[in-house]
Amino acid sequence: YRYPIEPLQEQLRRYLGTLTMGDLWQAEPATDLVTTTFDLLDNRTRFVKPWKAEYAPWPVVQAVLASCAVPTYFPVIAGRYVDGGVGSYANPCYLAAYEARFCLGWDPQETTIISLGTGRLPRTLQPGMAERFWTWDWLMPVLGAFEQSAADQQVHLVDTFFDQLDFRRFQVDLREPIQMDDVGQLDRLAAYGVELGHMILDDQLDRAMGITALRAPQPE
C-alpha cells in the first residue's frame, strides 16, 4: 500500500475521540450513521450502524477507517475490511433511502435525501483506441465502467422505487481525470466544489435522474 494508516487514524481520534457507534444511538436526539465496508473474509458488504448490537461497540474511528481503506492506498483494517465503495455502494443513495423508509420507518413524503457525487469522469477514449489496448490498459476503463454504472444504478433505483421521496442527486462533470491522492489538484477540486454548489442552488440535478423506462410496443 502507498500510505500508512496511522496519520489518518490520529487525526480522526483528534476530533472523534473514543466515541462509539452505539453512543450515537444513545444520544439525544439519536443519530443514525450508516457506513459501508467490504468484508474480504465473508466476501460481502457490511452495513455498520449504531443501532445494530454487533457494531455498537465499534469506535467511530474504526468505522470510518474501515469505510475508506482504499485497496493499494491504505492497509486492510483489522485484517479484513476495505473501502465500502469496493462493492455496489460507492454511491449510497439507495442505501440511505432504504434505511429511512424500511429501517427507521420515516414517512417518504416528509423525507428529503440529498446525494452529492464526487465527479463524473470525462470521456477520454476515441474510436479505435481500445483495439490497441494492452492487457493492463483495460484496468482503468473497466473499473471506471463498474463504478459509474453502479453509481447511476443507485440513482435510478431510488428515483424509480422511492418516487414519493424528495430525492435530489447532484453531480459535476470532470473535465480531466484526477487521481484521488493528487494533492496538487486541490485548487481545481475546490473549483469543482464551487461549481457543484451553484448546481445545488439552481436545483440542477444529475442527468442520471433523467433515466426513464421505454415501454415496449404492444404486439399486433
Set out the residue ranges of the language-model regions.
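Patatin-like phospholipase
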Residues: 1-220
